[in-house]
């Protein structure tokens, strides 16, 4: 048990020689607990040096060791869900010395990534995909007579998503040889592991019982009534002492729950269960943050850590991915998530019909206070984005006004529900789209790069793109009072520090504003890159418009700017393809206006992980790159170099 993060590299003699799972399998079982201890301490040290996901990895140290010890990875397929818990996996699969680069530009990904290692069988970041992917691999093995084993590791939180149960149902129907390990780390499925349940789970995982069961099955299936009676008897015995009846009903052979930190037991049960043909599920109980006292006491707060600076204390990061707030006296800028949460609470005080809905992102979306103050009007539906959106649609049918707080990347999972269940029926649902744009170290799996593009084509929906904290509050209020589907997109973290007007204002839908008059070029800005547009404009005497809405566009303002200026430059933190800039060009083309437009936004590629500033530079959206791209574009149009320079940025 550790109370502090090691600041010096720990002594890990056993781990130092285990650089691949093959070397791990050369150890005796008696050496595994020592390896797990060293692995846990090394994980504490490396995350302290770099920052990153923390609690989940500590909770699966023993499981990771056991899996790579029993399985013949990478020939056997091991599929992790979400990926927060895979740091121990990376350490044991040849990446120990690269851990200092994790979640940094050109370094290791914080999630499994197929291009990074042959041991990363499936790339993840979103939840609840592991069983489906593993089932595909297992079916492929059957079709090619490959004897490989396939194992999916999924947490109890991810198991709340419908996709996981769809995969379980298919796996059982196909009677596919695969194994699912349910990592239950917050007791949401089973409240306790009693002595009787533990005793029976040992029996059910034993070689003797498994052999007896399979032998009886071969004999009794020839006598349907006898087999059915035996199956029901076994089912009722298990149902009395374990929570596995659901999985047995689906068609899985179930063992558990067992202690997920008991290495000897894990090795024994995994090895025995892999010998059973067909679908099987091992239910283990683990503790998130295991081995580090502060994380065991506060698993949510220690979901991740910031890098530990010299002489600095540990800074936990909540599950939202943001560092915990400093003391009130040092707070200068609120996060956009705080702006949203404050607005929602203020609105709920005066509007009894407003409801808050989120798919397992209460803390990350800034809804903790709303949930505490208005519990009857708050719905955390767990990892069920599709359900969240259609739930909102049903509530809107009964004259309530739901606000769905959802990350941009996760809204992708509920697109059909947004189109079919909300927009098509013109229902009054507001979407507070968090994490729009680049998200830094979490990388492409979590980037909100596409929401303007996939929303803009939906009839009747309106899309707001606030450029600062005050615009975020006022556009949320304006969108909320629009009778129909409305979306407001805003980024992770803090804004420029605009003064927030607490009195809500109705801003006209689809109307922008001209902020700066200039010559030759005018910026048509959508969203939080506005300070960069202004800086470049001031250095070059360009004009600037803050559009506020990506849909509907301010037609009058755009036509006026196209008449006043020789060139327009659209700027957004969304994919160029189908984005707001594309909308501007479509509008001008429809009006027969030939003013050249340079659309600046995220390129047609997946940007890797790194600091937000680094990713903006890689995308050509930092101030220097914006200026350079405009210069190059103008030189092509003018036939000569346009030598304007940025000053005092």
Swiss-Prot record:
Q: Which GO terms describe its molecular function?
A: 1-deoxy-D-xylulose-5-phosphate synthase activity; magnesium ion binding; thiamine pyrophosphate binding
Q: Which InterPro entries match?
A: Dxylulose-5-P_synthase, THDP-binding, Transketo_C/PFOR_II, Transketolase-like_Pyr-bd, Transketolase_BS, Transketolase_C
Q: Which cofactor does it need?
A: Mg(2+); thiamine diphosphate
Residues where thiamine diphosphate binds: 84, 125-127, 157-158, 185, 292, 385
Q: Where does Mg(2+) bind?
A: 156, 185
Name residues in a coiled coil: none
Q: Which reaction does it catalyse?
A: D-glyceraldehyde 3-phosphate + pyruvate + H(+) = 1-deoxy-D-xylulose 5-phosphate + CO2
Sorted alphabetically, the Gene Ontology BP terms of this entry are: 1-deoxy-D-xylulose 5-phosphate biosynthetic process; isopentenyl diphosphate biosynthetic process, methylerythritol 4-phosphate pathway; terpenoid biosynthetic process; thiamine biosynthetic process
The entry's free-text remark on the cofactor is: Binds 1 Mg(2+) ion per subunit.
Q: What are the record's GO terms for cellular component?
A: cytosol
- Recorded metabolic or biological pathway in which this protein acts: Metabolic intermediate biosynthesis; 1-deoxy-D-xylulose 5-phosphate biosynthesis; 1-deoxy-D-xylulose 5-phosphate from D-glyceraldehyde 3-phosphate and pyruvate: step 1/1
- Membrane-spanning ranges: none
Keywords (A to Z) from UniProt: Isoprene biosynthesis, Magnesium, Metal-binding, Thiamine biosynthesis, Thiamine pyrophosphate, Transferase
Concerning PANTHER family, the annotation shows: 1-D-DEOXYXYLULOSE 5-PHOSPHATE SYNTHASE-RELATED, 1-DEOXY-D-XYLULOSE-5-PHOSPHATE SYNTHASE, CHLOROPLASTIC
Role noted for this protein? Catalyzes the acyloin condensation reaction between C atoms 2 and 3 of pyruvate and glyceraldehyde 3-phosphate to yield 1-deoxy-D-xylulose-5-phosphate (DXP).
Family under the similarity heading? Belongs to the transketolase family. DXPS subfamily.
What is the protein name given in its UniProt record? Answer: 1-deoxy-D-xylulose-5-phosphate synthase
Species of origin reads Saccharophagus degradans (strain 2-40 / ATCC 43961 / DSM 17024)
| Organism lineage | Bacteria, Pseudomonadati, Pseudomonadota, Gammaproteobacteria, Cellvibrionales
The gene that this protein is the product of is dxs
């Amino acid at each position: 048990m550790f109370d502090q993060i090691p600041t010096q590299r720990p002594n890990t003699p056993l781990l130092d020689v285990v650089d691949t799972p093959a070397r791990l399998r050369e150890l005796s079982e008696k050496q595994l607990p020592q390896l797990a201890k060293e692995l846990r301490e090394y994980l504490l040290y490396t995350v302290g040096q770099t920052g990153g996901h923390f609690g989940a990895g500590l909770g699966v140290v023993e499981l990771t060791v056991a899996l790579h010890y029993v399985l013949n990875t990478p020939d056997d397929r091991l599929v992790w869900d979400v990926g927060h818990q895979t740091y121990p996996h990376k350490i044991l699969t040849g990446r120990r010395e690269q851990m200092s680069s994790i979640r940094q530009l050109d370094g290791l990904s914080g999630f499994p990534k197929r291009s990074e290692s042959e041991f990363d069988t499936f790339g993840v970041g979103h939840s609840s995909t592991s069983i489906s992917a593993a089932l595909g691999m297992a079916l492929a093995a059957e079709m090619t007579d490959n004897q490989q084993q396939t194992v999916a590791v999924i947490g109890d939180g991810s198991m709340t998503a419908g996709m996981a149960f769809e995969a379980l149902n298919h796996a059982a129907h196909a009677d596919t040889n695969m194994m699912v390990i349910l990592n239950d780390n917050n007791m949401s499925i089973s409240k306790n592991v009693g002595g009787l349940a533990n005793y029976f789970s040992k029996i059910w995982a034993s070689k003797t019982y498994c052999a007896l069961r399979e032998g009886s099955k071969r004999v009794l299936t020839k006598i349907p009534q006898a087999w059915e009676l035996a199956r029901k008897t076994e089912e009722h015995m298990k149902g009395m002492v374990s929570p596995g009846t659901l999985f047995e009903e689906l068609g899985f052979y179930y063992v558990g729950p067992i202690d997920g930190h008991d290495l000897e037991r894990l090795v024994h049960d995994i090895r025995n269960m892999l010998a059973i043909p067909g679908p099987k599920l091992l239910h283990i109980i683990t503790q998130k943050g295991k081995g580090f006292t502060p994380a065991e006491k506060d698993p949510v707060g220690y979901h991740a850590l910031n890098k530990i600076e010299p002489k600095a204390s540990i800074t936990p990061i909540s599950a939202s991915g943001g560092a915990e707030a400093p003391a009130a006296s040092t707070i200068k800028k609120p996060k956009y998530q705080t702006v949203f949460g404050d607005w929602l609470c203020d609105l709920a005080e005066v509007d009894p019909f407003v409801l808050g809905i989120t798919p397992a992102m209460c803390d990350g979306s800034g809804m903790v206070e709303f949930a505490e103050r208005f519990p009857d009007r708050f719905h955390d539906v767990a990892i069920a984005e599709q359900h969240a959106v259609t739930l909102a649609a049903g509530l809107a049918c009964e004259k309530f006004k739901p606000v769905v707080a959802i990350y941009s990347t996760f809204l992708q999972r509920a697109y059909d529900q947004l189109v079919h269940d909300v927009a098509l029926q013109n229902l009054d649902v507001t979407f507070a789209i968090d994490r729009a744009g680049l998200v830094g170290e979490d990388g492409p799996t979590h980037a909100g790069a596409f929401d303007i593009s996939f929303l803009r084509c939906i009839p009747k929906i309106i899309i707001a793109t606030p450029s600062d904290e005050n615009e975020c509050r006022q556009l949320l209020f304006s969108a909320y009072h629009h009778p129909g589907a409305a979306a407001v997109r805003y980024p992770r973290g803090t804004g420029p520090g605009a003064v927030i007007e607490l009195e809500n204002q109705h801003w006209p839908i689809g109307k922008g504003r001209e902020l700066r008059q200039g010559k030759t070029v005018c910026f048509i800005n959508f969203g939080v890159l506005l300070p960069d547009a202004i800086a470049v404009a001031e250095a070059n005497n360009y004009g600037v418009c803050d559009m506020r809405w990506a849909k509907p566009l301010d037609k009058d303002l755009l036509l006026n700017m196209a008449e006043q200026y020789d060139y327009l430059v659209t700027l957004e933190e969304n994919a160029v393809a189908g984005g707001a800039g594309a909308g501007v060009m479509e509008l001008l083309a429809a009006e027969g206006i030939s003013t050249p437009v340079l659309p600046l936004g995220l390129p047609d590629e997946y940007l890797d992980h790194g600091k937000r500033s680094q990713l903006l530079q890689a995308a050509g959206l930092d101030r220097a790159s914006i200026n350079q791209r405009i210069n190059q574009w103008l030189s092509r149009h003018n036939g000569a170099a346009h030598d304007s320079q940025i000053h005092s940025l």
